[in-house]
Protein backbone atom coordinates (compact mmCIF):
# COMPACT_ATOMS: atom_id res chain seq x y z
CA UNK A 1 0.00 0.00 0.00
CA UNK A 2 1.45 3.33 -1.12
CA UNK A 3 0.27 6.15 1.20
CA UNK A 4 0.84 8.73 -1.54
CA UNK A 5 -1.81 7.11 -3.72
CA UNK A 6 -4.03 5.41 -1.12
CA UNK A 7 -4.43 7.96 1.69
CA UNK A 8 -6.91 10.84 1.36
CA UNK A 9 -6.61 13.80 3.72
CA UNK A 10 -9.41 16.01 5.06
CA UNK A 11 -8.27 19.56 5.81
CA UNK A 12 -10.06 22.24 7.83
CA UNK A 13 -8.64 25.70 8.41
CA UNK A 14 -5.26 24.64 7.00
CA UNK A 15 -5.00 21.73 9.45
CA UNK A 16 -5.36 17.99 8.93
CA UNK A 17 -8.76 17.04 10.34
CA UNK A 18 -9.15 13.48 9.10
CA UNK A 19 -8.04 10.78 6.71
CA UNK A 20 -9.33 7.85 4.67
CA UNK A 21 -6.95 5.04 3.72
CA UNK A 22 -8.07 2.74 0.91
CA UNK A 23 -6.66 -0.79 1.10
CA UNK A 24 -7.20 -2.58 -2.20
CA UNK A 25 -7.58 -6.37 -2.36
CA UNK A 26 -7.67 -6.88 -6.11
CA UNK A 27 -7.73 -10.67 -5.92
CA UNK A 28 -11.26 -10.57 -4.45
CA UNK A 29 -12.20 -7.14 -5.89
CA UNK A 30 -12.61 -5.62 -2.44
CA UNK A 31 -11.52 -2.37 -0.83
CA UNK A 32 -11.30 -1.77 2.91
CA UNK A 33 -11.64 1.84 4.04
CA UNK A 34 -9.96 2.93 7.28
CA UNK A 35 -11.16 6.39 8.21
CA UNK A 36 -11.00 8.75 11.16
CA UNK A 37 -11.82 12.42 11.65
CA UNK A 38 -11.64 15.03 14.35
CA UNK A 39 -14.31 14.32 16.95
CA UNK A 40 -16.33 17.44 16.13
CA UNK A 41 -16.53 16.28 12.49
CA UNK A 42 -17.82 12.76 13.18
CA UNK A 43 -20.93 11.97 11.10
CA UNK A 44 -20.67 15.38 9.45
CA UNK A 45 -21.05 16.25 5.81
CA UNK A 46 -17.28 16.64 5.66
CA UNK A 47 -16.72 13.06 6.78
CA UNK A 48 -19.37 11.82 4.34
CA UNK A 49 -17.56 13.57 1.48
CA UNK A 50 -14.25 12.08 2.62
CA UNK A 51 -15.72 8.57 2.56
CA UNK A 52 -17.34 9.21 -0.82
CA UNK A 53 -13.92 10.21 -2.14
CA UNK A 54 -12.53 6.97 -0.76
CA UNK A 55 -15.25 5.03 -2.58
CA UNK A 56 -14.43 6.83 -5.82
CA UNK A 57 -10.78 5.85 -5.42
CA UNK A 58 -11.75 2.24 -4.70
CA UNK A 59 -13.91 2.16 -7.83
CA UNK A 60 -10.98 3.22 -10.01
CA UNK A 61 -9.17 0.13 -8.70
CA UNK A 62 -11.95 -2.17 -9.90
CA UNK A 63 -13.40 -2.90 -6.47
CA UNK A 64 -16.87 -4.43 -6.59
CA UNK A 65 -17.43 -4.02 -2.85
CA UNK A 66 -16.05 -1.80 -0.07
CA UNK A 67 -16.04 -2.46 3.67
CA UNK A 68 -15.64 -0.13 6.62
CA UNK A 69 -15.63 -1.06 10.33
CA UNK A 70 -17.18 0.95 13.18
CA UNK A 71 -17.36 0.37 16.93
CA UNK A 72 -20.66 0.03 18.76
CA UNK A 73 -20.88 3.51 20.25
CA UNK A 74 -20.75 5.94 17.34
CA UNK A 75 -23.08 8.44 15.69
CA UNK A 76 -21.63 7.56 12.28
CA UNK A 77 -23.89 4.61 11.43
CA UNK A 78 -26.69 6.75 10.00
CA UNK A 79 -24.17 8.78 8.01
CA UNK A 80 -22.78 5.61 6.41
CA UNK A 81 -26.27 4.45 5.51
CA UNK A 82 -26.94 7.81 3.86
CA UNK A 83 -23.78 7.33 1.79
CA UNK A 84 -25.05 3.91 0.67
CA UNK A 85 -23.53 1.42 3.11
CA UNK A 86 -25.45 -1.26 4.99
CA UNK A 87 -24.50 -3.24 8.09
CA UNK A 88 -23.21 -6.54 6.68
CA UNK A 89 -21.62 -8.27 9.67
CA UNK A 90 -21.24 -7.83 13.42
CA UNK A 91 -18.16 -9.09 15.23
CA UNK A 92 -17.76 -9.63 18.96
CA UNK A 93 -14.69 -8.15 20.62
CA UNK A 94 -13.79 -10.67 23.33
CA UNK A 95 -11.23 -10.51 26.14
CA UNK A 96 -9.45 -13.19 28.15
CA UNK A 97 -7.99 -11.90 31.42
CA UNK A 98 -8.00 -14.93 33.68
CA UNK A 99 -5.32 -15.34 36.34
CA UNK A 100 -4.43 -18.87 35.24
CA UNK A 101 -4.08 -19.88 31.57
CA UNK A 102 -5.89 -23.02 30.41
CA UNK A 103 -4.03 -26.32 30.24
CA UNK A 104 -2.72 -27.35 26.85
CA UNK A 105 -3.36 -31.07 26.43
CA UNK A 106 -1.74 -32.24 23.20
CA UNK A 107 -2.47 -35.76 21.91
CA UNK A 108 0.71 -37.79 21.24
CA UNK A 109 0.19 -37.76 17.47
CA UNK A 110 0.37 -33.94 17.39
CA UNK A 111 3.00 -31.38 18.32
CA UNK A 112 3.19 -27.60 18.73
CA UNK A 113 5.94 -25.53 17.13
CA UNK A 114 6.72 -21.83 16.85
CA UNK A 115 7.14 -19.81 13.67
CA UNK A 116 10.64 -19.17 12.37
CA UNK A 117 11.94 -16.95 9.59
CA UNK A 118 11.88 -20.00 7.27
CA UNK A 119 8.15 -20.65 7.75
CA UNK A 120 6.50 -17.98 5.57
CA UNK A 121 5.28 -20.49 2.98
CA UNK A 122 4.08 -22.90 5.67
CA UNK A 123 2.05 -20.15 7.34
CA UNK A 124 0.71 -18.98 3.98
CA UNK A 125 -0.47 -22.47 3.09
CA UNK A 126 -2.32 -23.16 6.34
CA UNK A 127 -3.90 -19.70 6.49
CA UNK A 128 -5.18 -19.89 2.92
CA UNK A 129 -6.43 -23.44 3.44
CA UNK A 130 -8.26 -22.49 6.63
CA UNK A 131 -9.89 -19.28 5.39
CA UNK A 132 -10.23 -19.17 1.60
CA UNK A 133 -13.92 -18.60 0.88
CA UNK A 134 -14.60 -17.03 4.28
CA UNK A 135 -16.28 -13.63 4.38
CA UNK A 136 -13.79 -10.79 3.94
CA UNK A 137 -10.72 -13.00 3.53
CA UNK A 138 -8.25 -12.34 0.73
CA UNK A 139 -5.76 -15.18 0.08
CA UNK A 140 -2.17 -14.26 0.88
CA UNK A 141 1.17 -14.73 -0.82
CA UNK A 142 4.27 -15.90 1.01
CA UNK A 143 5.80 -12.45 0.45
CA UNK A 144 2.85 -10.77 2.18
CA UNK A 145 3.01 -13.20 5.09
CA UNK A 146 6.76 -12.71 5.48
CA UNK A 147 6.29 -8.94 5.57
CA UNK A 148 3.48 -9.09 8.13
CA UNK A 149 5.33 -11.56 10.34
CA UNK A 150 8.16 -9.05 10.66
CA UNK A 151 6.02 -6.05 11.57
CA UNK A 152 6.73 -4.31 14.87
CA UNK A 153 3.62 -5.70 16.61
CA UNK A 154 4.46 -9.32 15.77
CA UNK A 155 6.99 -11.63 17.34
CA UNK A 156 7.73 -14.93 15.69
CA UNK A 157 7.19 -16.77 18.98
CA UNK A 158 3.58 -15.48 19.04
CA UNK A 159 2.75 -17.55 15.93
CA UNK A 160 2.04 -21.16 16.86
CA UNK A 161 1.57 -24.20 14.60
CA UNK A 162 -0.19 -27.47 15.40
CA UNK A 163 1.26 -30.33 13.35
CA UNK A 164 1.25 -34.09 12.93
CA UNK A 165 3.87 -36.14 11.11
CA UNK A 166 2.32 -35.28 7.74
CA UNK A 167 0.64 -31.86 7.83
CA UNK A 168 0.32 -28.51 9.50
CA UNK A 169 -3.23 -28.95 10.77
CA UNK A 170 -3.81 -25.59 12.46
CA UNK A 171 -2.26 -22.35 13.62
CA UNK A 172 -2.74 -19.38 15.93
CA UNK A 173 -1.30 -16.02 14.86
CA UNK A 174 -0.82 -13.80 17.87
CA UNK A 175 0.59 -10.31 18.16
CA UNK A 176 1.10 -7.66 20.83
CA UNK A 177 -0.38 -4.19 21.14
CA UNK A 178 -0.32 -1.29 23.62
CA UNK A 179 -3.32 -0.82 25.89
CA UNK A 180 -3.38 2.03 28.41
CA UNK A 181 0.30 1.75 29.18
CA UNK A 182 0.32 -2.05 29.26
CA UNK A 183 0.84 -4.75 26.65
CA UNK A 184 -2.16 -6.72 25.42
CA UNK A 185 -1.99 -9.96 23.50
CA UNK A 186 -4.12 -10.20 20.37
CA UNK A 187 -5.18 -13.34 18.53
CA UNK A 188 -5.47 -11.97 15.02
CA UNK A 189 -6.06 -15.28 13.19
CA UNK A 190 -6.72 -18.83 14.32
CA UNK A 191 -7.71 -21.68 12.03
CA UNK A 192 -7.80 -25.41 11.38
CA UNK A 193 -7.21 -27.07 8.01
CA UNK A 194 -10.56 -28.23 6.55
CA UNK A 195 -9.35 -31.85 6.48
CA UNK A 196 -8.88 -31.84 10.26
CA UNK A 197 -11.99 -30.08 11.48
CA UNK A 198 -14.38 -31.78 13.88
CA UNK A 199 -11.56 -33.47 15.83
CA UNK A 200 -11.37 -31.07 18.79
CA UNK A 201 -8.12 -29.53 17.56
CA UNK A 202 -9.33 -25.92 17.75
CA UNK A 203 -9.16 -25.94 21.54
CA UNK A 204 -5.63 -27.34 21.47
CA UNK A 205 -4.23 -24.62 19.22
CA UNK A 206 -6.27 -21.94 21.02
CA UNK A 207 -4.90 -22.86 24.44
CA UNK A 208 -1.37 -23.11 23.04
CA UNK A 209 -1.74 -19.61 21.60
CA UNK A 210 -3.15 -18.24 24.86
CA UNK A 211 -0.29 -19.69 26.88
CA UNK A 212 2.35 -18.21 24.59
CA UNK A 213 0.73 -14.76 24.52
CA UNK A 214 0.18 -14.87 28.28
CA UNK A 215 3.94 -15.20 28.75
CA UNK A 216 4.50 -11.95 26.82
CA UNK A 217 1.53 -9.73 27.69
CA UNK A 218 0.35 -8.13 30.94
CA UNK A 219 -3.13 -6.91 30.07
CA UNK A 220 -5.09 -9.90 28.84
CA UNK A 221 -5.67 -11.30 25.36
CA UNK A 222 -8.32 -10.12 22.90
CA UNK A 223 -9.82 -11.37 19.64
CA UNK A 224 -12.65 -10.67 17.21
CA UNK A 225 -15.18 -13.29 16.11
CA UNK A 226 -18.17 -13.20 13.77
CA UNK A 227 -21.35 -13.04 15.84
CA UNK A 228 -22.83 -15.72 13.54
CA UNK A 229 -20.04 -18.18 14.37
CA UNK A 230 -21.70 -19.84 17.35
CA UNK A 231 -19.26 -22.81 17.64
CA UNK A 232 -16.25 -20.46 17.80
CA UNK A 233 -17.92 -18.20 20.37
CA UNK A 234 -18.71 -21.21 22.59
CA UNK A 235 -15.10 -22.38 22.26
CA UNK A 236 -13.73 -19.01 23.32
CA UNK A 237 -16.17 -18.76 26.22
CA UNK A 238 -15.18 -22.24 27.39
CA UNK A 239 -11.62 -21.06 28.10
CA UNK A 240 -12.64 -17.75 29.71
CA UNK A 241 -13.16 -15.19 26.94
CA UNK A 242 -16.00 -12.72 27.46
CA UNK A 243 -17.60 -10.10 25.23
CA UNK A 244 -16.49 -6.52 25.87
CA UNK A 245 -17.66 -4.72 22.72
CA UNK A 246 -19.11 -5.16 19.24
CA UNK A 247 -17.70 -4.11 15.88
CA UNK A 248 -19.93 -3.49 12.90
CA UNK A 249 -18.72 -4.04 9.34
CA UNK A 250 -20.54 -1.91 6.78
CA UNK A 251 -20.66 -2.81 3.12
CA UNK A 252 -20.99 -0.73 -0.03
CA UNK A 253 -21.65 -2.40 -3.37
CA UNK A 254 -20.55 -0.67 -6.57
Walk through the language-model features, giving the residues of each.
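A conserved beta-strand-loop-helix scaffold within acyl/acetyltransferase catalytic domains
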Residues: 1, 20-28, 136-183, 190
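Conserved acetyl-CoA-binding loop-helix of GNAT-fold acetyltransferases
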Residues: 43-56, 189-192, 198-215, 233-238
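Conserved hydrophobic beta-strand within the GNAT/NAT acetyltransferase core sheet
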Residues: 66-70, 187, 221-225
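Acyl-donor-binding surface of acyltransferase catalytic domains
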Residues: 37-108, 250-252
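Residue-level recognition of the GNAT/N-acetyltransferase active site
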Residues: 34-42, 71, 193, 197, ...
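A short beta-loop-alpha structural element at the N-terminal edge
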Residues: 111-125
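Conserved active-site alpha-helix within GNAT-family acetyltransferase domains
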Residues: 71-89, 203, 227-245
Amino acid sequence: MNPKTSCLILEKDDHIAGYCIVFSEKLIQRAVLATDVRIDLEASGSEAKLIQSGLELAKTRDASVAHLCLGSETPRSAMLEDVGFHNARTYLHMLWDEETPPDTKIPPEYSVSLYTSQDAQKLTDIQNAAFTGSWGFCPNTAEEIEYRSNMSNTRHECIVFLENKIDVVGYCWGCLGPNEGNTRGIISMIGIHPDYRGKGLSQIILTAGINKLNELSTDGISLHVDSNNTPAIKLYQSVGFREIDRLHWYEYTF
